[in-house]
Regions:
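PP2C/PPM-type serine/threonine phosphatase catalytic domain
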Residues: 1-245
């Protein structure tokens, strides 16, 4: 598989606190992609997201093997998220100006014809199919809980006053629990990882249409960014697209 990514500060923020990376794994053709959306005063959100990305990747490279089973890969990803959490928390403890900083994380590690997906917070993973965009991850957020309890709709969640409140993040707590998913990909299916800066400005249907307008993966990402900016882009926008060559 191959991948490309895009990140932008948006139209209403002064600093981009999102970080993404794509690197090769241990197996032939294996890719690792990760997106983090940081939070914290001054530039601490950017520090949190970049620290988490680097720690997650470094730890994963140290344990990845080409012959890993899916279950072993799931365990490795969870372990590396805990290490990334410790790195962010340690920095906050050592630098008082960064107290309380944190970051979301969503990652994909390709594994043969599929991928192992992991998330903490409200950065998302989607499967881009032939007819629609299928959300893989569940947000760890206040509004997600309200949707699941039937108190609000998904459309209402996009403008809810508490839409930015997440219930899990790397950094604030000693221990973190991540959700891990196994995904099988068809020959024409792609994976989209993104920060909530994209999600709050467009519906899944609109995002699917924007991706479909691109003749290349890079153009698809440009269309997603353009869509977000047309809606005011109130937050940083980051997206990574993984696709078959």
């Amino acid at each position: 598989m191959k991948a490309c990514g895009i990140t932008d500060v948006g139209l209403q923020r002064h600093e981009n606190q999102d970080t993404f990376a794509v690197e090769r794994g241990a197996a032939d053709g294996q890719l690792i992609a990760v997106v983090c959306d940081g939070m914290g005063g001054e530039n601490c959100g950017q520090i949190a997201s970049s620290l988490a990305v680097r720690a997650f990747l470094d730890e994963l490279h140290a344990v990845l093997r080409a012959d890993m089973t899916t279950e072993q890969l799931r365990e490795a990803v969870s372990f590396c998220v805990s290490k990334a959490n410790a790195a962010v928390k340690r920095h906050a403890q050592e630098h008082t100006e960064c107290h309380g900083m944190g970051t979301t994380l969503v990652s994909a590690v390709t594994n043969g014809s599929g991928a192992v997906i992991c998330n903490v917070g409200d950065s998302r993973a989607y499967r881009v199919g032939a007819e629609r965009l299928e959300r893989i991850t569940r947000d760890h957020s206040v509004v997600e809980g309200l949707i699941e309890s039937g108190n609000i709709t998904a459309e209402q969640a996009r403008t809810h006053p508490n839409r930015n409140l997440i219930t899990r993040a790397l950094g604030p707590e000693e221990h973190i629990e991540c959700d891990v998913y196994d995904v099988t990909l068809g020959a024409d299916e792609r994976l989209l990882l993104c920060s909530d800066g994209l999600v709050v400005t467009a519906t899944d249907e609109e995002m699917y249409e924007a991706v479909g307008r691109g003749d290349t993966p890079e153009e698809s990402l440009e269309h997603l960014l353009e869509l977000s900016k047309q809606r005011g882009a109130p937050d940083n926008v980051t997206a990574v697209l993984l696709y078959h060559e």
